[in-house]
């Protein structure tokens, strides 16, 4: 790392792999971006011992980060670290640059003091691309149970890789579908395929345990003692009570 020179080493059945504490581990426990100490060689020139370095720190679950490209700085939480010319950034087997990192990524970071040695994207992102959005513009899409976004014309959205149920609804039209977001790829969805038969309504039963509470949907007070029929889509909900 200090010289910037790259070397290629080989390992075999007799090679021992160890964590930084000296405990045995498998070769599968070594990942892109790890820093290791390599010692000895057998008669075939293969390494005898490969051990994770105890001279570096690691953070395998970085999500709160930002990159200051102008100053070559990686911010993790409230701490700043230097990005150098020899800092390696990986996504799977690919070497990437800081422009490819987004806030949706989860990183494994290795450093020495305040210098970043390597960054590996452990959970990457892909792109969701919507088409024929006009019927749903101004309403919200839902991806899984954590991602909500207002729909705009033919929008695209960076999304962490994984499997999701995509749901859309507006003015009584809508539906859902299962999608797969793959790292570095674009998943295209035509919202015309999700509008379904409409306009549709859904019955909502409100559970209220505050005496005298009032509920308003789209500015109108409702009787919540029985299920209320509401069209699919975006609505405003207001609850008031004395005190």
Regions found by a protein language model. Give the residues of each.
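Solvent-exposed strand-loop boundary residues in beta-sheet-rich modules
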Residues: 3, 145-147, 172-174, 219-221, ...
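Short, solvent-exposed S/T- and G/P-enriched segments that are highly enriched in secreted/extracellular
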Residues: 23, 94-96, 146-158, 219-230
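N-terminal beta-strand/beta-hairpin edge segment
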Residues: 15-16
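Short, solvent-exposed loop/linker segments at beta-strand-coil boundaries, enriched for Pro/Gly
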Residues: 136-138, 147-149, 210-214, 221-223
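Short, flexible, surface-exposed loop segments at domain boundaries
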Residues: 1-10, 20-82, 93-143, 158-206, ...
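LysM (lysin motif) carbohydrate-binding repeats in extracellular/periplasmic proteins that recognize
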Residues: 79-91, 220-221
